[in-house]
Regions:
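Elongated alpha-helical scaffolds
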Residues: 100-103, 115-121
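Conserved "HGTGT" condensation-loop signature of ketosynthase/thiolase-family condensing enzymes
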Residues: 1-93, 110-117, 124-272, 276-286
Length: 286
């Protein structure tokens, strides 16, 4: 069956996990998030295979960077482009938000299907682990920034506009933080399941079993930050290394910003992938 030429396909991926050695303070020139993102992009270009690497890099319509918590870069997309050796037609930065990476993939796929772009490089990363170690050791990190006047003269696009993270009802009640909001969601789910005959303890055990399965996958993933399989009981039992964060979520059930990691995707139209000679066995349909 022929593939529609405007079908979006992922043709390359790259991941970087940097684990700081020992407990010594980090050096001032420790790799920052944009350095890790650039490395992930190079890996993704290589992953695309064959001679397509250079051709893809020279034909990037959009470089989109998920905004970081680790550092205020001004324009992280500009820095990543320079470090990765890309000259994208458009530089895009997302607003803050945990949903931004997946939403960025979705919107990119729609733009490709609509014929608006042909090749996009998506990336994101954090070096919060190094940032916090440096702060504790009073080390001033020599990480890059784009000056305000440079940003003003040539600003990146802001993908999708700033997100509204709270409803007016939540704001009126002082509910702002994820640690407040997600337990409320969980309470609503438990209430609904309770009406269906599932008691809260059974529900929590089922959720913990799902998390235990996630940890099994992480245990065999060389890029996972916490590659250790946990039992369901370990997941839900509070302790010295697994404190209760927001009932019923313990620490291991929460997202973790305290990492040095990055990832990148190359997404393009099927037509462009064929023209660039990317082997079909490298295509993944998002």
């Amino acid at each position: 069956m022929p593939v529609d030429p405007r079908t979006p396909v992922i043709v390359g991926v790259g991941q970087v996990t940097r684990r700081p050695d020992g407990i010594d303070p980090p050096a001032a020139d420790s790799p920052d998030a944009t350095a890790l993102m650039a490395e992930a992009i190079r890996l993704a270009l290589t992953d695309a295979g064959g001679h397509a690497t250079d051709q893809i890099g020279a034909r990037v319509d959009v470089l989109a960077v998920v905004n970081t918590l680790s550092w205020r870069y001004g324009d992280p997309a500009r820095i990543v482009a320079e470090r990765a050796g890309l000259e994208p037609r458009r530089r895009v930065v997302t607003p803050m938000g945990g949903n931004s990476p997946q939403a960025l993939v979705n919107s990119t796929a729609r733009s490709i299907a609509a014929g608006e772009i042909d090749v996009a490089v998506l990336t994101g990363g954090e070096t919060w682990r190094t940032r916090m170690r440096a702060r504790r050791a009073e080390v001033e990190l020599d990480w890059p920034r784009v000056e305000e006047d440079q940003v003003a003269a040539d600003p990146p696009e802001v993908w999708g506009g700033e997100l509204t993270m709270n409803s007016e009802h939540e704001t009126a009640l002082g509910v702002y933080m994820p640690v407040q909001i997600y337990p409320l969601f969980e309470s609503a789910i438990r209430a609904r399941r309770g009406a269906e005959g599932v008691d809260p303890i059974t529900h929590l055990e089922q959720v913990a079993t799902m998390w235990a399965r996630f940890s099994e996958v992480a245990a065999s993933n060389p890029y996972a930050w916490s590659p250790r399989a946990l039992s369901a009981a370990e997941v839900i039992t509070p302790g010295p290394t697994n404190r209760m964060v927001g009932a019923p979520y313990t620490k291991v059930m929460n997202s973790n910003n305290d990492v040095d990691m990055a990832a990148a995707l190359i997404v393009c139209s099927a037509e462009r992938a064929s023209a660039l000679g990317v082997p079909r066995d490298r295509w993944v349909f998002p």
